[in-house]
Amino acid sequence: MAVMNELKIVFMGSPEFALTPLKMLLAEGYDICGVYTQPDRPAGRGRELCPPPVKTLALEHGLAVYQPQSLKKPEEQAFLKELKPDVIVVAAYGLILPQAVLDIPVYGVLNIHPSLLPRYRGATPVAATLLGGDEWAGVSLMKLEAGLDTGPVYSRSMVAIRPEDTTPILADKLAFIGGCMLLELLSQIPSLPEPQVQDNTQASYFGMVTKEMGLINWQTSAVEIERRVRAFFPWPGVFTTFNQKTLKILEAKPRNLGLGLKPSEVRVYEQSRVMVGSASGELEIIRLQLEGKAGCSAADFVRGQRNFDGVNLGV
């Protein structure tokens, strides 16, 4: 019978979020008999094929890497079955696992999901947590089932959201917490606890983030816009237009100074601070980036754009 560190584990993950759990498994000496990650994708201006971060790490450690387009084909499922995994660990893999795959490992498929399930099921739970204005973020370690993040949960862990948290900052914290939870659960094999069924009446979903979501609607509140700045950093970013050019807001804070600004109206305040009106309160822009330029502080931007005071953004 398999015990800790003798377990044969197939790891499935693709982005930065998945690196920390994989590193932790390697540090504990687990037998990673295969790493599944998404195919290389074109990236950058040259559109050259770029490997997922997990592939790079796996190859550095001499692990076998597999990049199928899908796991729905019987031949892919048969190959995975030949690896004879005791456990499959999933961390932001990005491909759907059919029931035939879920049935392969002896102790099931464990999924590290960075939200407090059943809240924020779906593809981008960290961004959803920031958009929701939650005080707490969290990780759920669940047994994967055929439904979208509907499987029973072994454990949950919470962390307070800080004002400076962006999606990558918060995701890094949750990846570490999730890795610790994973190691704790693996240490209990073969006597795994009974996972708790989710309350589907409390479920919420958040799908893929699109570029269009980054466009600022100044008819919303400063609080909501600032949440989007943190949730959509670094991609797609939050942006508006100024002089027919895209203006990205890299960092901002909601204020309530009573300046009487109309939505999208800019006020250079105290000579070097930039306030923009919204449906409720002012948005203070801390850092920004004009199309074709490097990012800079609001003070530096104002010095180079003498006509910024009084303009309306996004028109």
UniProtKB/Swiss-Prot annotation:
Signal peptide: none annotated. Keywords: Protein biosynthesis, Transferase. (6S)-5,6,7,8-tetrahydrofolate binds at residues 115-118. It catalyses: L-methionyl-tRNA(fMet) + (6R)-10-formyltetrahydrofolate = N-formyl-L-methionyl-tRNA(fMet) + (6S)-5,6,7,8-tetrahydrofolate + H(+). Disulfide bonds: none annotated. GO terms for molecular function: methionyl-tRNA formyltransferase activity. InterPro entries: Fmt, Formyl_trans_C, Formyl_transf_N, Formyl_transf_N_sf, Formyl_transferase-like_C_sf, Met-tRNA-FMT_C, Met-tRNA-FMT_N. Pfam families: Formyl_trans_C, Formyl_trans_N. Attaches a formyl group to the free amino group of methionyl-tRNA(fMet). The formyl group appears to play a dual role in the initiator identity of N-formylmethionyl-tRNA by promoting its recognition by IF2 and preventing the misappropriation of this tRNA by the elongation apparatus. It is an enzyme of class 2 (transferase). GO terms for cellular component: cytosol. SUPFAM superfamilies: FMT C-terminal domain-like (SSF50486), Formyltransferase (SSF53328). Its EC number is 2.1.2.9. The keyword Protein biosynthesis applies. Belongs to the Fmt family. Gene3D superfamilies: 3.40.50.12230. This is Methionyl-tRNA formyltransferase. The keyword Nucleus does not apply. It comes from the Bacteria.
